[in-house]
């Protein structure tokens, strides 16, 4: 079995693959201060609840956009699983030709998403990931990672509105009954949700115009279904795109793989 770990700024998503199929998945809060033993105990609890044993895991791969957490995670893997994990980064086989000015600047999550999207949905593609930041990645017809855009995530923007405007409350990010809000909460929900729908549609439209192509648009991340329900510009929502990409990259970099 393969353990895949995707460390984001807000949440860490973990999954277990067996024979190429995602059998289990969990989401925990990302903490920069946990030790390898604390991570080990969290994994022990998740595994016990799912009827799994550490000894069943024979491979681990990690992608992370939070460097301070990596030392503890790597120590956890070697101490509790007795496995040296693969770490997504420069030098790994991905099949991507990255056309960024400095390819090392491209986040591991964006690379992993691109690998999965190409494999599953073909190319050209735009991949939109609704995470702590909302990222847009353009992959052309030759599987070249051409670049993209990075915007503040929906949750960040919502929290900024609450924390910087004294009379505005903290709200749930959900669809309001009306676009024209009749109270403060519904007005904020309308502005946040439909403002982001407009952002997605605007950036996707401009990327297509610049590339002079009609790529598929793949969305992932916790709020992807909410946005996709309000916009025709998103073709496919894949909530496990990153975990699928990690499994693919692991297989391409196994000892003995071609």
From Swiss-Prot:
Annotated GO CC locations: cytoplasm
Annotated positions binding K(+): 129
Annotated catalysed reactions: (R)-pantothenate + ATP = (R)-4'-phosphopantothenate + ADP + H(+)
GO annotation, biological process: coenzyme A biosynthetic process
MF terms in GO: ATP binding; metal ion binding; pantothenate kinase activity
Main location: cytoplasm
Enzyme class label: transferase
Cellular location(s): Cytoplasm
Keywords, alphabetical: ATP-binding, Coenzyme A biosynthesis, Cytoplasm, Kinase, Metal-binding, Nucleotide-binding, Potassium, Transferase
Subunit annotation: Homodimer.
Protein name per its UniProtKB record: Type III pantothenate kinase
Source organism of the structure: Bacillus subtilis (strain 168)
Native organism taxonomy: Bacteria, Bacillati, Bacillota, Bacilli, Bacillales
């Amino acid at each position: 079995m393969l353990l895949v770990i995707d460390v984001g700024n807000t949440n860490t998503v973990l999954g277990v693959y067996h024979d190429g199929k995602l059998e289990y998945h969990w989401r925990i809060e990302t903490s920069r201060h946990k030790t390898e033993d604390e991570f080990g105990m969290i994994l022990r609890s998740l595994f016990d609840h799912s009827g799994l044993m550490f000894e069943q895991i024979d491979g681990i791969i990690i992608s992370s956009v939070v460097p301070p957490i990596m030392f503890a995670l790597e120590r956890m893997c070697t101490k509790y699983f007795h496995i040296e994990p693969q770490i997504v980064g420069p030098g790994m086989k991905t099949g991507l030709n990255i056309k960024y000015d400095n390819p090392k600047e491209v986040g591991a999550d964006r690379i992993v998403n691109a690998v999965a999207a190409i494999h599953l949905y073909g190319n050209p593609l735009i991949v939109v990931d609704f995470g702590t930041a909302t990222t847009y990645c353009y992959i052309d017809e030759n599987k070249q990672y051409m670049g993209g855009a990075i915007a503040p995530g929906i949750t960040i923007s919502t929290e900024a509105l609450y924390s910087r405007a004294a009379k505005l409350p903290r709200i749930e990010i959900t669809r309001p009954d009306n676009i024209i809000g009749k109270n403060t909460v519904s007005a904020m929900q309308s502005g946040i949700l439909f403002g982001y729908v407009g952002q997605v549609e605007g950036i996707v439209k401009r990327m297509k115009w610049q590339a002079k192509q009609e790529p598929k648009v793949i969305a992932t991340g916790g709020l992807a279904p909410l946005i996709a329900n309000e916009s025709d510009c998103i073709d496919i929502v894949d909530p496990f795109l990153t975990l699928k990409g990690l499994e693919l990259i692991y297989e391409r970099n196994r000892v003995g793989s071609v």
